Amino acid sequence: MEAITKYGSYFNVRFLSRLCWRLNLSSSYHYPLLKSSLSFSRFQSPKKLCLVRATTNPTDDNSTTRSFTPHPPSLWGHHFLSASVNQTEMDDLWRQIEALKPIVNAMLLPCNGADAKKITCFIHTLVSLGVSYHFEEKIVEFLKDAFENIEDMIIDCKEDDLYTVSIIFRVFRLYGHYITPDIFNRFKGDDGNFKKCLNDDVRGMLSFYEASHFGTTTEDILEEAMSFTQKHLELFLVGEKAKHYPHITKLIQAALYIPQNFNLEILVAREYIDFYELETDHNEMLLKLAKLNFRFLQLQYIQDLKTLTTWWKELDLVSKIPVYFRERLAEPYFWATGIYYEPQYSAARIMLAKSIILVDIVDNTFDVYGTIDEVKSLVQAIERWDSDAVDVLPDYLKVVFRTTFDLFKELEEYVSSEARSFTMQYAYEQLRILMKGYLQEAEWSNRGHLPSHEEYIEVGVASTAGEVLLAMTFIPMGDAAGVGVYEWLRSRPKLTHALFVKSRLRDDIATYKEEMKRGDVCNGINCYTKQHKVSEEEACIEFEKKTNHMSKVMNEEFLKAAKFIPLHILRPVLNYGRLADVCYKYGDGYTFAGEKIKDYITSLYVDLITL
């Protein structure tokens, strides 16, 4: 298959050309001069109520008037249409990156005098700076060989070197190697508690805290480590020493907010570049590579967003159907960036963002606007999956169905030429399952039925849209996601099940208050409180415990799956779990882009890193 290797190995020309043709854009890259700043309109409060003409009969568009509360507008709107990127700068950045890669690559070679322990710590730095993908094959090969002598590597560490032992643990687990947490027993005293001499080792404590989040369901020592390190890191932040080490303090604050293993790789990179630059022993070549790489990615992201915004503007759904859905562009693209941030997945990010936008519109059709008869007719049309199926739908649902149909047909045309029709077959299956999940929830609400928590979770896992979005995630990856990947997904592995449960629970905690306000009582928290006779606060605490348990299950199942599933397939799965933490741990970051999500998006797509 023809592929562009200029900016990455898997950038598919045929897919990008078709994407650009549909948008009436050239398939060649255009990066005019980036504007010095992007202006964003101030957040406008939505009107409290919209009255629109709608239908209670699937074939009658004029039978009733219904009301709905519109979602708040996006903070970014269509502003990325005016953003422009310089092709010359892109090419120059890439040339500099390519020139630095051999220099950094040489640092991964043991023959240069570095021992396995030092190289492992260096890999941790590459990962944290967001540049490890440039050296992935070399890293995987090194760790595979080094794991054969992992005991010797640990023994070679000083008895009190908590920092290095924690880094080694993190790196090997990150790459799918099971390394026992018993290596941390050396840091315990005769009383069974962690030694007091560790209290003053701030770097070691931070690294140990990060390592504790790789724990599985049976590793109690890592649970102890999490409590121990969190306590002492919080004490450090309120002490005098924090004032003297501001860059370490900032990194600790970020870790306590969301640890690296639960954070998005690209967000970790942005934070860590600032930290690494202030380290007195930083490597200038590596720092330069990290900055060049991040700026290059930012420019590509801006170009992707411009392409996505152009598609949305030409689609023009806001003039065709009532705007009962969340009109979002930067947010779904942020999700797609969180799944795969590397440059070779540009076309895949755009397609995934489009899929997220579409799924959200369908979700809101069931949740906010459609009558029970209407959504039933939509489910039946999806089951038929025929362009003639629109005849029985009301006008606004004809638009929704046609948009869904066209997006899938676009992907179908792409994969059929590559003998990859099995990918679309799986995607269709998951779309139908998703529709049935949405319909079940709508019927519960229509009847005023409150299911048991167990019933709700069973259906709610399907209605997270996780399975259909995973299918859409892998389709644009081409041969990198073969038939074996889809057979694995179809087997419903414990890893993906834990992911969907975690996502459901995170979503429920973040959104139940807004759902209750609009009269949607069939949500996870409400089901749990009524069944178990507990308060909302107690239910949220229990959901948080369950979420943490699912994170451990994911860690556990990842280590098992890594033995036979490639890392480039497993990482997007893990990244969906990380998105749940980043976007929903402290509120609904998709509907209401609070300061944190706003800062994330701004740091990636607006404020270019200074070289």
From Swiss-Prot:
Pathway involvement of the protein, from the record: Secondary metabolite biosynthesis; terpenoid biosynthesis
Signal peptide annotation: none
MF GO annotations: magnesium ion binding; terpene synthase activity
Motif DDXXD motif per record, residues: 363-367
Binding residue positions for Mg(2+) 3: D507, T511, E515
Secreted among keywords: no
Free-text remark on how the cofactor is bound: Binds 3 Mg(2+) or Mn(2+) ions per subunit.
Major subcellular location class: cytoplasm
Gene Ontology terms: biological process: diterpenoid biosynthetic process; terpenoid biosynthetic process
Record-linked InterPro entries: Isoprenoid_synthase_dom_sf, Terpene_cyclase-like_1_C, Terpene_cyclase_plant_C1, Terpene_synth_N, Terpene_synth_N_sf, Terpene_synthase-like, Terpene_synthase_metal-bd, Terpenoid_cyclase/PrenylTrfase
GO cellular component, one term: cytoplasm
Catalytic reactions on record: (2E,6E,10E)-geranylgeranyl diphosphate + H2O = (3E,7E)-dolabella-3,7-dien-18-ol + diphosphate
Residues engaged in binding Mg(2+) 2: D363, D367
Family matches, as Pfam families: Terpene_synth, Terpene_synth_C
UniProt function note: Involved in terpene biosynthesis in roots. Possesses sesquiterpene (C15) synthase activity and diterpene (C20) synthase activity in vitro. Possesses dolabella-3,7-dien-18-ol synthase activity in vitro. Catalyzes the formation of dolabella-3,7-dien-18-ol from geranylgeranyl diphosphate.
Record comment regarding domains: The Asp-Asp-Xaa-Xaa-Asp/Glu (DDXXD/E) motif is important for the catalytic activity, presumably through binding to Mg(2+).
Family: Belongs to the terpene synthase family. Tpsa subfamily.
The protein's name in its UniProt record: Dolabella-3,7-dien-18-ol synthase TPS06
Lineage, broadest ranks: Eukaryota, Viridiplantae, Streptophyta, Embryophyta, Tracheophyta
